[in-house]
């Protein structure tokens, strides 16, 4: 039986990248409690099939519900692309129709129309997110006139995970993908970082992008979207506890998570190990 008492807002990611989303949310909405779950033991999700990503994401969402969350944010583009819709349509009605799961692709798609002048947008993301065409679909639904080009960046997330963001290898792989997307569509004036790890590569990304091309990290837009959502849905907002606390869970070694999390958050964290599946 799931608790009906107010609980934390859950944030889920396959690894550490969702910490950039959590950071953005906490900057704007510091008063709420948060519970972050990283399925680091099974990361990365990017190359995995739709079915596997859905099953892993469903397990995480159920666990967060069991731990008191009434609202869960999928702070992972791959999970948002491959699992969100099925969970919303098929699982929530059976688990608890009053609970909510939100993704991070839609909030980015909503604001992109105000950010691009040329109406040509690039998406840099994992292979799974690019193959799903989720950004193309969401952007075209809202802004049919915008041309979207995507490029998969398979080595970018591991560069961040293994603390290699400042290495010469990072320069090589970042330049390679930036050159590729600008060749694909030279009229691009706005780039969406469609993986939550990528903001940590921002100095390298800006180094190789042509002058005047804007980069859109997701954290601030997801936070603004969540704020608006809670204002529009008071019945959900009332179920979100407000003690300004944050706790972290990982499916891997907690000590490793602590060390990596500090790269993303620049602050020490308390973390517990958890098993999914």
Residue ranges and their predicted role:
Residues 1-277:
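Non-catalytic structural scaffold of enzyme domains
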